[in-house]
Regions:
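Electrostatically charged, flexible surface regions
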Residues: 41, 145-247
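Glycine/threonine-rich flexible loop motifs
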Residues: 105-114
Length: 247
């Protein structure tokens, strides 16, 4: 099984390396291609970091613990990396794309803005099965994230993911703790776990602030179940027409 590992936190992310090791240890043929710099919040954007989409810089990297696994630092956002992989830029096009492990949850309809999820959705448009993996690390948490917990939960889905129809996408969120049970299937919350507020400063700029949302979460939604300490998995669909809309 040819597998691409990517993310939006960048090629140096420990979460990326942990996910790559998990996929390799599962017996999959793994290649890692991730942004040379952090590209969080880029959605499925097809943007090259240098602004020239005709040429994208790619640098081979060596990562401890991933001997024998090709690792590429790519001057591009994760959506473009997934597209490049589908076109054979890093070897045979992947049958499976794993995106993550993201430092922080990706829940609710706010996944639209996630580079982690955006890479998975882009890959699905090109026939790959994709899994986005995120660890629910609080923004102010200074302890070491439990990457191994996320890998263990994700690995429990690997075989099921591989058996899904081409183009399938799963979004997995895992609580940041030493152990977690298998994920519960969940619907998308109306919003993510973070709400953005804007304020006109009067000096020609707009001030942005982020606030964690913990109240009024829809029961059974991914954000609500994750807040209760459960891992969640949500099946996503990429861009599709709406034939029922009357206009």
């Amino acid at each position: 099984m040819k597998v691409l590992i990517t993310n939006d936190d960048g090629v140096e992310s420990p979460g990326l390396h942990a996910l790559a090791r998990g996929a390799r240890d599962h017996g999959w043929d793994v290649v890692v291609a991730a942004p040379a710099e952090e590209a969080s919040g880029t959605g499925a954007g097809l943007t090259a970091a240098a602004g020239d989409t005709r040429r994208v810089a790619v640098e081979r990297r060596e990562v401890p613990g991933l001997a024998g696994v090709p690792v590429y630092a790519v001057a591009a956002h994760p959506g473009l990396i997934a597209l490049l992989a589908a076109q054979g830029a890093f070897g045979e096009p992947p049958e499976v794309v794993l995106s993550g492990i993201n430092l922080g949850a990706n829940t609710g309809r706010a996944v639209l803005h996630s580079g982690t999820v955006g890479a998975a959705l882009t890959a699905s448009l090109h026939g790959a099965r994709a899994l986005a993996v995120s660890l629910d690390v609080a923004p102010d948490d200074e302890t070491d994230p439990h990457w191994d917990t996320a890998v263990t939960v994700a690995a429990g889905l690997f075989d099921r993911l591989a058996a899904l129809p081409p183009g399938s996408v799963l979004n997995l969120n895992v609580p940041d703790r030493a152990e977690s049970g298998p994920p519960r299937r969940a619907g998308l919350a109306e919003s993510g776990t973070v709400q953005v507020h804007v304020e006109d400063t009067g000096d020609g700029t707009i001030a942005l602030s982020a606030e964690l949302v913990g109240d009024d979460l829809k029961p059974g939604s991914d954000a609500a179940l994750l807040a209760e300490g459960h891992a969640t998995v949500t099946a996503l669909r990429s861009v599709a027409e709406d034939p029922d809309l009357v206009w």
